[in-house]
Amino acid sequence: MGTESGSDPESSSNGWSRARGLVVKTLVLIGGALLIKRLTKSTTRRDHARVVSRSLTGEKFTREQASRDPDNYFNIRMLSCPAAEMVDGSEVLYLEQAFWRTPQKPFRQRLYMVKPCPKELKCDVEVSSYAIRDAEEYKNFCDRPKDQRPLPEEVIGDIGEHLTTIHLNCCDRGKRCLYEGSTSPGGFPNSWNGASYCTSDLAVLKNNEIHLWDRGFDENRNQVWGPKEGPYEFKPATSSSINENLSALNILYQSSIDKPIQGSLILQD
């Protein structure tokens, strides 16, 4: 009795299963690689702008730095919160700085506009600062209930003189910062304390820490205001700093004598 010629059906089935499994694995690997590539590319400049805006928002202090180097740095309270949104999606933040003992008396009030860098520029986020037309109306803006603040449309109408613009880029891997940047080399016009122009450096670190270095220079490039040793290091408020701040507020509100703070202010611009 002779044997039949041809392939074994079971062997053919196993071979096809292995081939199909190999194809599926290959497709999964390719799909995974494409997904990772897509996710990597999905972070847009607008996403970066949102991160920077969130990092700037909140209550921060330079308490640690002032304790470490009291001769060169004050303990400053910086408070910022969203105030409006422009038609193009740019976020407008209200920002004020005050000595930690007198948080209700800010010495600096600004509107910051945070938006993605224009396509023609090699940067990720653009941060511009503006004066406020009626700054008195905005004192302690972020501490007030929302129904007691100027309306968003009023905020936009109160955007005053353009002061500075900083272009931020994502920090290289291995650095402490997330974003860093500065004003253009020539800075921006400024006349405070004998200055002819000012510069500003900004770094956004992890945990919403902000390093800000504002300086003024005269026509001969001599620095006439601002810290010389390095930027102010603003760190998010801790429970202890909040308690100290509340104690300071209670003392000030109970006191009928308004004593001026001694010392030269190096943050004004």
UniProtKB/Swiss-Prot annotation:
Cell cycle in keyword set: yes
One of the Pfam families matching this protein, by short name: CpeT
Q: Which UniProt keywords apply?
A: Cell cycle, Cell division, Chloroplast, Developmental protein, Lyase, Membrane, Plant defense, Plastid, Plastid outer membrane, Transmembrane, Transmembrane helix
Expression sites (tissue/organ): Mostly expressed in shoot apices, to a lower extent, in leaves, inflorescence stems, buds and cotyledons, and, at low levels, in roots and siliques.
Topology within the bilayer: Single-pass membrane protein
For this protein, the record's PANTHER family field holds: CHROMOPHORE LYASE CRL, CHLOROPLASTIC (PTHR35137:SF1)
Name of this chain's protein = Chromophore lyase CRL, chloroplastic
Corresponding gene? CRL
